[in-house]
């Protein structure tokens, strides 16, 4: 899949009220675009081929409600493509921050670690716990105010 939006993808986004897609990144299975909703607020839209993994990510995203994880907005399919819309957070991923600045101060590291620990605790203490299996600097987004967000979707804990 190319970084630019195809005509069909642009049409599908527009039909659901999202405009001005701008490529912001990619993972193993999806590309992520920043889009504007009807209120002109930014949202993140993950576009990928519809697979069981994509369907599971949509279900998981709907269930998780914690400040460390992007808020679910909606999802839909259009042919072979799936669209998952979530809250968009401006900021920088921790990997880029470390590459630019070098190591974090002890205070910065402690604040980030505390937020991540609270989010992981939330996942593990749910009635149906989730595991976050992709914890790495590239998946930790840091805002200017120091708050964090974990990207990628947690998975239900194997029983």
What are these regions (language model features)?
Residues 94-104:
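AlphaC helix of the protein kinase catalytic domain
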Residues 52-63:
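AlphaC helix of the eukaryotic protein kinase fold
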Residues 71-82:
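Short beta-strand micro-motifs within the conserved protein kinase catalytic domain, predominantly
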Residues 21-27, 32:
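Protein kinase glycine-rich loop
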Residues 124-142:
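Catalytic-loop of the protein kinase fold
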Residues 151-159:
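Single conserved hydrophobic/aromatic residue that forms the stacking wall/gate
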Residues 31, 35-51:
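ATP-binding glycine-rich loop module of kinase domains
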